[in-house]
Amino acid sequence: MAKNTCAICGAEVNLITGQALADKQYICRKVCGKKCLKAFDKISAVLGDVTAHIAQVERGTKIWNEVLLPLKKSKNKEEKLKCFNNSAGGDLYVSPSTGLCAYVETRYKIFIFGKSEHACVYRIADLYGYEYETEKVKNSEGKEETKHYCVILFNNTAGLYTFRIQVSGQKAFAELEKYFDTLFGIQKTLGNMANNWKNQMNAIKAAAGAVKSAADGSLDEFQAANAAGAIDTAVFGDRTELIAKADAILANYPG
């Protein structure tokens, strides 16, 4: 049986004990592979992705235990975490009071009472996608059924930047979507459509002005930044306060 070496810890691995990566390097399943969350796709990852994710989990688990977990049972409504349970894997916890959210995987010990929680922690402001998705699967009886998911996508994130939360159906997804839309101040209702349209049109005009300036050579960095910021605010909401809250905490956890 062919033997290889774990690119992280140097352990000798074979086709059974090793995990092949997209760049044809290997990591050991027993130690290094277990440091990754189940939602992380190791097959399509290269070594840099894996090491970034392992560091992400180490840092995230520490922040979860020290900052967010104590808020899970808080009696203060302003501090209490919002939880989106996921029957297909880790749960998503959102903490507007800290500007952070966490994807938490619970691992249970076999034959021993107890469990451990491992987490990736993100700035809420970096959440740039929460889209509805369905998947046709066959159940244990061989009958086809539909699974419903919310696909979560984070910007400016190394390691695990996207994962799926299984929801009970489209109504449950709509509730999740409304929660984040409200949190970000994104208006999607018919009553606010005119106001929202005006904001987006102003953003587009700012971008158009930037394009015109680029064409005649008069575009400066300040104007370009304002144009990009205008589109972001109109489409994704103003996240300035969430960024400030999150960065104040993350400064204590360099990584």
Where are the regions a protein language model picked out?
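Anionic N-terminal interaction surfaces
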Residues: 41-109
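Acidic, Ser/Thr- and proline-rich intrinsically disordered linker/docking segments
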Residues: 130-255
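Glycine-centered tight beta-turn/hairpin loop motif at sheet-sheet or coil-to-beta transitions
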Residues: 85-89, 115-117, 156-160
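Secondary-structure transition/turn motif
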Residues: 31, 104-109, 155-158
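Short, aromatic- and cysteine-enriched interfacial helices/patches
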Residues: 16, 110-113, 184, 235-236
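N-terminal cysteine/histidine-rich coordination modules
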Residues: 1-61
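Phosphoinositide-binding peripheral membrane targeting modules
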Residues: 100-143
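Hydrophobic beta-strand residues in large extracellular and virion-surface proteins
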Residues: 6-9, 28, 92-94, 101, ...
